[in-house]
Amino acid sequence: MKIGFSFLSLKTLSVKRAISITKKLGGNTLELFGDLVLFYRGKFCEKPESIKEFAVKNDIFLTMHLPYIDINLASFNDEIWEKSIESILKAIEYGEKAGIKRAVLHPGGVPLSHLVLIFLAQRRLRKALEFILEKAEKYDVEVCIENPYFEENDIFSNVDQFHKFIKGFGGKLKVCFDFGHAHISKKGIDYSLNLLKPFITHVHIHDNHGEKDEHLSLGKGSIDFKKYLDFLRNFDGTIILEINSLKDKREDLKRSVEIIKGEV
């Protein structure tokens, strides 16, 4: 089982330290924070080659959450759209040097929920993904798109629309299934998981109370994870605990791993 943590969950600015913490907490996978590649022109970044070497030495599998802060791959503003693509490609290039094999991105948003705007935004996203998938394929990096909440400013109105969009890529585009997001969405986890399952190669897992994205440790919200343990324990992809609540401690992170592994 490839299971571990989001870089942000471990509350450190050092990737090597995050790798060490991941091992101590019972994980074997770490998801890098792609925005760090862009902050102050990468000022906080460690050399990707040294990250790769340290990860291999510690037997840690690396994935990356591609940039999402101020990024919109569906933007109608050409300059923002182009810079968003450029930012994603820069992060993929860095990630490939660091040894990542899988990367996650967000779909983007619209200023108003209107059928015409949603249609046009999806076209912009499709075009952006064509550039991104072409680059990722050269680097042997798999790209997964994350299911949103399907709220007012999302470019997909529901999970069925999201599913139809993904099918249009003929298997080249995979899905990062976010349990917390699905729990908030109107159709819920069961329907969303069953619909998207053929495309899911990556999972983000965290808890909430069904109203907002709280990123809590497992068991601290209202998701009944017992229903999904068989799926998770037999899953061939990567599982990332995206527990970013400031209230959760490392003991909570460790227990979340143990719950999924069946150790508690």
Language model features with spans:
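N-terminal pre-domain/capping segments
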Residues: 1-92, 96-97, 261-264
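Histidine-acidic metal/acid-base catalytic patches
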Residues: 1-2, 16-23, 101, 156-177, ...
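Hydrophobic faces of well-ordered beta-strands that scaffold small-molecule active sites
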Residues: 3-7, 30-32, 62-66, 103-105, ...
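Active-site-proximal loop/turn and secondary-structure-junction residues that shape catalytic pockets
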Residues: 9-11, 34-36, 68-70, 107-111, ...
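Active-site acidic/histidine proton-transfer and metal-coordination neighborhood
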Residues: 16-17, 56-57, 74-174
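Short, solvent-exposed loop/turn segments at secondary-structure boundaries
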Residues: 41-45, 74-79, 115-120, 154-157, ...
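Catalytic-core regions built around general acid/base machinery
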Residues: 46-59, 128-135, 192, 227-231
